[in-house]
Each structure stands twice: as C-alpha cells, then as structure tokens.
Amino acid sequence: MKTYRIRKDDKVMVIAGKDKGKVGKILKILPKRNAVLVEKVNQVKRHTKANPYAKTPGGIIEKEAPLDISNVALLCEGCAKPAKVGYKYTADGKKVRFCKKCNHEIA
C-alpha cells in the first residue's frame, strides 16, 4: 500500500486547478484513486432523488469532489506556506514530520 506525507485532518492548500490557492482540511484520503477530499474545496452539485424510507429529501445538494493528491500541498503552521515535508526523529525516538523551509515540526 502506498504511503502519503499528508494525513486526515491536515490543513492543505490547493496548488493546481480551478480552486488554486484555497485552503481546507482533509476529510478523507482515497488511496485507490490517488485522491483526497478537502473541506469546502472542489464543490460540485448533485441532483438527488427523495427517499421516503431513509427520510432524505430530494433536491440539489453541494458536496466535495475528490482532488488528485498531487494538486494539494501540506500547509506549514510555522511559515504559513505550502511545505515540502521531511521526517526526523525526536530525542525520545518518535518519528515526526517537519517543514523543510522553516524546520517547523508538523503534528
């Protein structure tokens, strides 16, 4: 299975596409599609049919569509810019991510 340098609940910035420059939180990672769902980014409208058994109303709803993972970059809290991510070990032996620009640890 492929590993990624970004995780669920990370703050990311879109670096390519129609929503370039927008910032949001990762809601879900889709490894089979090599994509991510980012909160309030890449919104699409879907027409849904009412389902009386599930008590869901019909109509037009807006939801997030997947973005390719190469179009997002992790946002560093230290320098507030998209970051290239590296890994290092702390003094107690814990592996952590860090921003290669400002050397700030990313939780």
UniProtKB/Swiss-Prot annotation:
GO terms for molecular function: rRNA binding; structural constituent of ribosome. It comes from Solidesulfovibrio magneticus (strain ATCC 700980 / DSM 13731 / RS-1). Keywords: Ribonucleoprotein, Ribosomal protein, RNA-binding, rRNA-binding. GO terms for biological process: translation. One of two assembly initiator proteins, it binds directly to the 5'-end of the 23S rRNA, where it nucleates assembly of the 50S subunit. One of the proteins that surrounds the polypeptide exit tunnel on the outside of the subunit. InterPro entries: KOW (IPR005824), Rib_uL2_dom2 (IPR014722), Ribosomal_uL24 (IPR003256), Ribosomal_uL24_CS (IPR005825), Ribosomal_uL24_KOW (IPR041988), Translation_prot_SH3-like_sf (IPR008991). Gene3D superfamilies: 2.30.30.30. Belongs to the universal ribosomal protein uL24 family. Pfam families: KOW, ribosomal_L24. One of its GO terms (cellular component) is ribosome. This is Large ribosomal subunit protein uL24. Part of the 50S ribosomal subunit. Signal peptide: none annotated. SMART domains: KOW. It comes from the Bacteria. The gene is rplX.
